[in-house]
Each structure stands twice: as structure tokens, then as C-alpha cells.
């Protein structure tokens, strides 16, 4: 079989930078799926992407499908011929459909009888005749939320398409993609290199485009170059560049010929909190800030341009002129905001509605303040500082800086609190109240910060559930899932002695008559249980372990964590699955019991050696188990219970539980109930698989 390398490039207008990687990866995955469905072999495949192009290279692609034999079974021989040995209508119809006569059919003998069989040789189709259709289907499946039309064309895509190049080796693959006919012309850089290039071979795509077109279509190489050049530029300044990956990805997607340059701004702007300057540089301008070894912002920034200039200083000056007014705005907002304290802004919070049924932001901070103080008493934090931080937690929403740069809420609260003479614990709590903001974000660890962060999230959760606006499907306008995960992570990662039932009840009490949904506490608790499951699944804990713990519905996050770890460890023991099966058997037996069982086991009614042994073993373990369960030491307790495996196995082998004698039966059921109760102190291990 012969092989060749394939190139497919779609040349477009500038693609959305934040979607570029996803589009390219999806294009590749979709196309390789098409190749597999078509049974076309290939060695490897890679994607390329630049602002005005999506491309894929497939290496060592088979030039045709392999020939194959397809077996088509017909009717059973017994039904294929009549009593005189003549073909029946069913047999003739089947044969005709396969282009043969009944006499030409083979026979297939099986254990169930003999059948007519046609072995059809299917000649493989040439790859080049399949490529265009496969590529079009691959493009049709791209994640494009809002496709657009252009010109008089009815074709839709994420951006207008100008060129399509499909080369199988040196041969142009005939066909159209998105209404554009395939040829070997690719476009170079808008302002450098050749505007259009005739590509001779698929293998030369990257090199020709780079050398003649001044376009580096290798996304990862472009990203690595930007990163290396930016690090080197920062080192020359005696600092380190903030090369956050999301921004690095976005900048990589904005340029096809990256040139890294360094610029500066006036040192006076460093009097403004660094976060505001960084937000302006990164968010608005896509610049990389530079910090010294102590983490202090330097009056410099690094940016990436898309052109090699004969006079780079002109580009540098232009970017400095662009950023200066933005930094001046931040300076003005900061100086203006400093004239009023956070406390003085509380009255203005009365004019801002949090949610129609839940009142104003002022009412919200009063609830958060009370809730934070309540939590503080449970975890040993300073309740006065917690209450103060809760009260001031939303005051920065009324500042000019946060109104202009909304992502700085909390952060600016911290800076203004310090200027107002608030304690450091209060100031830091204002900054950390929204943590964790995203998956992988850190959680607050300072006691006052913990109190405010928990109070803020619980107020939202209980309030929104309390007015009947729980999340439905993927819709979650109040980010309740993130809030719930945040509560759990803060409790778990700080090993806090808090119970969700108690926290929910306190939050409900503080909302007072605002809430109209009587079932809110139960619904919020159930919501947390769902988040527990999602959280532990993300940590790689098997579903059966999670379900075993969920069956006991522990409501203290730290306790839930202890049980999860214990059951996960128990599951690795040699005795685990046998005891899980035994517990399931016990559960099924007890589920059928009507009426109450004896509260205690009557030793006089233990007649079989196996039941005596099990009862004795249980009696021996119970004094050891009680303090372990009381201390939530579930792992040691389950390890002790694992020693029951032999006694339990022997019991079920030798003892008839449902004895004819009612007293014996009830006593044995009581024994099994006692056995199961011990395991249920930790989890329902009958759910382990």
C-alpha cells in the first residue's frame, strides 16, 4: 500500500484569539475521526493555527482504503429451497440484491444450522476522492456558537474564508470547502513576505510559509518563542515577566510573526496599587507586566507586535502612548477613592439591590457580618474582626476603581481598608472573600478570611434557594455551584469543625422573612451532597466509595473527608469485597424483616458454633470500636472490622438465618443488625463493588 502526507489549510479573516486553539484541536480531532471511520490508516496527525488560518498535517496517510471481503448472510438453507429443491422467492430476492444467483452463493455452517452466504470483495476507494467531504464534515462540527455569512455566499463559518488548500503530497485534492475551491495558493503575512504563495508539496507547508510568507503557523513554536523572548527581555530589565498562560495563549493567537519589545511608563504610577496597573496592562492591552525579585512591579512592560519594524522605537512609543491614559485613569480613580473611607460608603449600599426579594447590598453585608461573627466563634477566630470585615466586604463596589475595573472587587477593598487603618486581618479578608474564584484557585487560610469567605457564599446559597431560584440544567446565574464547592473546599482544606446543617440554619435565620421556600434547608444540603460527589470524583475517588459515604449523609465536611479516606483505604484491603458482599446480603435480609428486632443479642439463643464465634468477635471488637468512631478514626475502625471477614463467611456457610424457630431467627437477625450497624458508623460498604 502506498502512503503520502496530507495538508489541509483554511485561510480566513482574523479568528477569535481565545478560540483559536480549541478550533484547531477540534478540526484535527474531527478529521482523524473521519479517517478512522473510513478505515484509512495514517501514522500521525498535527494541527497548526495562526490568526488567519487553521491547518492540519496528516503523515503517512494511505492513498486508498484497503480492499476487503464483506460477508453477507442470506436465508437459512432450509428456507432457501422448497421441497423440490428450487430456490424460494426469499433466496432469489437476497441473491438478486447481491448481484449473484442462488447457485453462486456459498454456504455457512454454524451450530444453529446452514445459511446461504455471499462473500463480496469490496475494492478500496481512493483517499483523494474522500478528503473534501471528510474535511467539510470536520469543519461543520467545529464549536462555533455564532457562525457568520459573508458577501453573497450562503455558507456560514466563524469568519469569512478566502483560501482553501488541500494537498496530498504534491497533488491538489479536488473539491470545495465552505464554498471555496481547493488549490495550492496560501497567503503570507499581511505586511511582510509574499502576499500569496504557490505551495509545491504538503511537506513544505511550515517552511515555505515561514520563509516566503513571514508566517509561523506552528502554534506551539510561536508560543515558546514569545515565552523565551519575553523572559530574556525581562531578565535584561532585572526582573521577571508575568507570563500567565491564558494571556500567553491569547497573544500567541493574535500574532503570526511575533516580535517581543520592551516599553516603560512613569514611575509615579507605581503609587497606584499594582493590581490595578496589572489589570490595565494585561486585560486591556495584552501586555506582560514585569516584577523585581521581591515581587514589586517595575515601571516596564513587555508586549508582542506582529511585524518586524525598521524603527521599533516608533512601535514602543506608540504603545507607551496608548497605555499612559489608562494608567492615568487608574491613578485618578485611586486618588479620588482615597478621600472616602469604606465605612462612609455603607450608606450608599442601601441604594443598590442585591436581589429583589433578598434586599439591598447593605442588608446583605449586615447578614454577612453576623454570619462571619457566628462562624468565628466556632473556629476560634476573632469575632469582632470577622464582623467588621463582613460589614465592609462590599463597600469597594461603590468606588470609582471597582466601577471601572470590576474584576478588582475585593482587591481594592483590601488596599482601601489598609489606608483607612483597618487591621491587616480585616483588610486581607476583604481581598480573599471571593476565593476560590476558579478551579485550582487557593482557598483562604487566615481565620478572619475564612469566616467572611464562608459567610459570603452561604448567604448567597441559602438566599437564592430560599426564593426558589435553584440552578436548573446548565444555567447557574448566581454561580451557586462554584459557591458550594468553595464552601466545601474551605472547610476541607482548613479541616474546620463546622457542620453544614448548622451553617445553613444560621444563614436561613439571618435572611428572616425574605425566604419563601420552606424546603430551602433540605435543598441546599442536597445541593452540597451533589457537590461532594462532583468534588471527590474530580479527585479520582471511585464512585462506589463516594456513594458508600453519601449513604450515611455526613453533614460535616471534615467528617465526610475522614470517611472518604477510610473507605478508600478499606477498599484496598483483601477482605473488603467479601465484606461488602456480606453487608449487601445482610441489608437485603434485614429489608424484608417486619416488626422490631430484639435490641440485644441473647447469648442463650446462640446455638451454632459459627454464630457464637461471630457474636464473640463482635463483642470483643465493640469496646475498641466505640472510641475510634467517637474520634472519627474511621480508617482504624474499618481495619478492625475487616478482621470479621472469616467469622462472617463461616456464619453464612453454616447458619440458617431464617430458622423455623422464631426466637432463633430473631436473635440471628439481631446479630446481623448489630454487625451492619458497626459498619454503618463509617459508611454503607454494601455499595462497594
UniProtKB/Swiss-Prot annotation:
Keywords: Aminoacyl-tRNA synthetase, ATP-binding, Cytoplasm, Ligase, Nucleotide-binding, Protein biosynthesis. Its EC number is 6.1.1.14. It catalyses: tRNA(Gly) + glycine + ATP = glycyl-tRNA(Gly) + AMP + diphosphate. SMART domains: DALR_1. The keyword Protein biosynthesis applies. It is an enzyme of class 6 (ligase). It is found in: Cytoplasm. GO terms for biological process: arginyl-tRNA aminoacylation; glycyl-tRNA aminoacylation. Its main location: cytoplasm. GO terms for cellular component: cytosol. HAMAP family: Gly_tRNA_synth_beta (MF_00255). NCBIfam families: glyS (TIGR00211). This is Glycine--tRNA ligase beta subunit. It comes from Shewanella piezotolerans (strain WP3 / JCM 13877).
Amino acid at each position: 500500500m502506498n502512503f503520502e502526507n496530507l495538508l489541509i489549510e483554511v485561510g480566513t479573516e482574523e479568528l477569535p484569539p481565545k478560540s483559536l486553539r480549541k478550533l484547531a484541536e477540534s478540526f484535527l480531532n474531527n478529521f482523524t475521526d473521519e479517517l478512522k471511520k473510513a478505515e484509512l490508516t495514517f501514522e500521525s496527525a498535527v494541527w497548526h493555527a495562526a490568526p488567519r488560518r487553521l491547518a492540519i498535517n496528516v503523515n503517512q496517510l494511505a492513498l486508498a482504503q484497503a480492499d476487503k471481503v464483506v460477508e453477507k448472510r442470506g436465508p437459512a438453507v432450509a428456507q432457501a429451497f422448497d421441497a423440490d429443491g428450487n430456490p424460494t422467492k426469499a433466496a432469489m430476492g437476497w441473491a438478486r440484491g447481491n448481484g449473484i444467483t442462488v447457485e453462486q452463493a456459498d454456504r455457512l455452517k454454524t451450530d444453529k444450522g446452514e445459511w446461504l452466504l455471499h462473500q463480496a470483495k469490496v475494492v478500496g476507494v481512493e483517499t483523494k476522492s474522500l478528503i473534501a467531504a471528510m474535511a467539510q464534515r470536520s469543519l461543520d462540527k467545529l464549536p462555533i456558537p455564532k457562525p457568520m455569512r459573508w458577501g453573497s455566499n450562503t455558507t456560514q463559518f466563524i469568519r469569512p474564508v478566502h483560501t482553501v488548500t488541500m494537498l496530498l503530497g504534491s497533488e491538489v485534492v479536488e473539491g470545495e470547502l465552505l464554498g471555496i475551491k481547493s488549490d495550492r495558493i496560501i497567503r503570507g503575512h499581511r505586511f511582510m513576505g509574499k502576499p500569496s504563495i504557490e505551495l509545491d508539496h504538503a511537506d513544505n507547508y511550515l517552511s515555505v510559509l515561514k520563509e516566503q510568507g513571514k508566517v509561523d503557523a506552528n502554534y506551539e513554536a510561536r508560543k515558546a518563542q514569545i515565552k523565551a523572548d519575553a523572559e530574556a527581555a525581562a531578565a535584561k530589565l532585572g526582573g521577571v515577566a508575568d507570563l500567565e498562560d491564558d494571556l500567553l495563549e491569547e497573544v500567541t493567537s493574535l500574532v503570526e510573526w511575533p516580535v517581543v519589545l520592551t516599553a516603560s511608563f512613569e514611575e509615579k504610577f507605581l503609587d497606584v496599587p499594582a493590581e490595578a496597573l496589572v489589570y490595565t496592562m494585561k486585560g486591556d492591552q495584552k501586555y506582560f507586566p514585569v516584577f523585581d525579585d521581591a515581587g514589586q512591579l517595575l515601571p516596564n512592560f513587555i508586549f508582542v507586535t506582529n511585524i518586524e519594524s525598521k524603527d521599533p522605537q516608533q512601535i514602543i512609543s506608540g504603545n507607551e502612548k496608548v497605555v499612559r491614559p489608562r494608567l492615568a485613569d487608574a491613578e485618578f480613580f485611586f486618588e479620588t477613592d482615597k478621600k472616602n473611607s469604606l465605612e462612609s460608603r455603607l450608606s450608599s449600599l442601601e441604594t443598590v439591590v442585591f436581589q429583589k426579594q433578598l434586599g439591598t447590598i447593605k442588608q446583605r453585608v449586615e447578614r454577612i457580618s453576623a454570619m462571619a461573627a457566628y462562624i468565628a466563634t466556632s473556629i476560634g477566630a476573632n469575632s469582632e474582626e470577622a464582623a467588621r470585615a463582613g460589614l465592609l466586604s462590599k463597600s469597594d463596589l461603590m468606588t470609582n476603581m471597582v466601577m471601572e475595573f470590576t474584576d478588582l472587587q475585593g482587591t481594592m477593598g483590601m488596599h482601601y481598608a489598609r489606608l483607612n487603618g483597618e487591621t491587616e486581618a480585616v483588610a486581607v479578608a476583604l481581598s480573599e472573600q471571593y476565593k476560590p474564584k476558579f478551579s485550582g484557585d487557593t482557598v483562604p487560610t487566615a481565620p478572619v478570611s475564612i469566616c467572611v469567605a464562608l459567610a459570603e457564599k452561604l448567604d448567597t446559597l441559602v438566599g437564592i434557594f430560599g426564593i426558589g431560584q435553584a440552578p436548573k440544567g446548565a444555567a447557574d446565574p448566581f454561580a451557586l455551584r462554584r459557591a458550594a464547592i468553595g464552601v466545601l473546599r474551605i472547610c476541607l482544606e482548613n479541616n474546620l469543625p463546622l457542620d453544614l446543617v448548622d451553617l445553613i440554619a444560621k444563614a436561613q435565620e439571618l435572611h428572616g422573612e425574605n425566604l419563601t421556600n420552606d424546603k430551602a434547608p433540605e435543598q441546599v444540603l442536597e445541593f452540597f451532597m451533589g457537590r461532594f460527589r462532583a468534588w471527590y470524583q474530580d479527585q479520582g475517588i471511585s464512585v462506589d466509595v463516594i456513594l458508600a459515604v453519601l449513604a450515611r449523609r455526613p453533614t460535616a465536611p471534615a467528617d465526610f473527608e475522614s470517611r472518604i479516606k477510610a473507605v478508600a483505604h478499606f477498599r484496598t484491603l483483601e477482605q473488603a469485597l467479601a465484606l461488602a458482599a456480606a453487608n449487601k446480603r445482610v441489608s437485603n435480609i434485614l429489608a424484608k424483616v417486619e416488626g422490631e428486632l430484639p435490641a440485644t443479642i441473647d447469648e442463650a439463643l446462640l446455638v451454632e458454633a459459627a454464630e457464637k464465634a461471630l457474636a464473640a468477635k463482635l463483642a470483643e471488637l465493640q469496646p475498641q470500636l466505640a472510641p475510634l468512631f467517637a474520634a472519627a478514626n474511621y480508617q482504624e475502625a474499618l481495619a478492625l472490622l475487616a478482621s470479621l471477614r472469616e467469622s462472617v463467611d463461616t456464619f453464612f456457610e453454616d447458619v440458617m438465618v431464617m430458622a423455623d424457630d422464631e426466637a432463633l431467627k430473631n436473635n440471628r437477625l439481631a446479630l446481623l443488625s448489630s454487625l451492619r450497624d458497626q459498619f454503618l458508623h463509617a459508611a454503607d460498604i454494601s455499595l462497594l463493588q
